[in-house]
Each structure stands twice: as structure tokens, then as C-alpha cells.
């Protein structure tokens, strides 16, 4: 699976969000970054898709990884065979 439909929900000042962005950027993943503090509809979408409001949250198709660190992100990408 490619990363073409990858959405990363973030909030300003979130250190784990920055770590997630660096991880994805360094490995060449393409993703849409959405700041849920600037977009109320995106915040509601985040809650609907993930059942919570924590960031970072990564959504790829039907796969959702909420509130994660780099180890969980790496495992998630490998498990779902998501390539840059």
C-alpha cells in the first residue's frame, strides 16, 4: 500500500506530532498534514475516525493509528505494508 492517502492530524506545540512528521519526512512518505486547531471540521473528523481527539493521529484508508510514538508508527507502517 502506498502513502498517497495518508493523513496526519496534528496540533501546534505537540512534540509527538513533530516527531511523527520528522519520521515520515526522513523516510520519504507523502502525507496530508491537518492542524485540527485551525480546522473545526477536521477536528470533528479526527474524533469520528479515531474515536478520540489526541494527536498525532494517522489515518490511511480504513487504518487508524491514534496517539502514537515513533515505535508504534514504525510497527503500524510495517504491519500494513505502507510504503513511501
Mark where each language-model region is.
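Local sequence-structure signature of Cys/Sec-based thiol-disulfide redox active-site neighborhoods
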Residues: 1-27
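ATP/adenylate-binding site constellation spanning eukaryotic-like Ser/Thr protein kinases
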Residues: 11, 51, 70
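Short alpha-helical
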Residues: 15, 41, 72
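Thiol-based oxidoreductase modules, predominantly thioredoxin-like and allied folds used
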Residues: 30-42
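Non-catalytic, surface beta->alpha helical segment in thiol-disulfide oxidoreductase systems
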Residues: 61-84
